[in-house]
């Protein structure tokens, strides 16, 4: 089975908003490979380290909010 990692990354980025705290900081509780790809795309800070959270970049926050609305919000 071929996996489209960009779609997975979009879902992970959107779901990171569920653990948002202290501004643009989010808990890093997702697959490490997906988190590394999001970092390589410039959407989050480096996930490697002891800290249990990462920071969404301005671009990452904007994209995460848009994806969350598109994927998970209902239309009135």
Show where each model-derived region lies:
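Basic amphipathic alpha-helical segments that dock to polyanions
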Residues: 35-41
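Short amphipathic alpha-helical interface segments
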Residues: 1-33, 70-73
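Short, amphipathic alpha-helical interaction segments positioned at domain boundaries
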Residues: 58-76
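Short, electropositive, low-hydrophobicity segments enriched in small/polar residues
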Residues: 23, 46, 64
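A short, conserved structural fragment
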Residues: 41-49
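Short functional linear motifs
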Residues: 32-35, 61
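Minor-groove-contacting beta-hairpin "wing" of winged helix-turn-helix DNA-binding domains
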Residues: 51-56
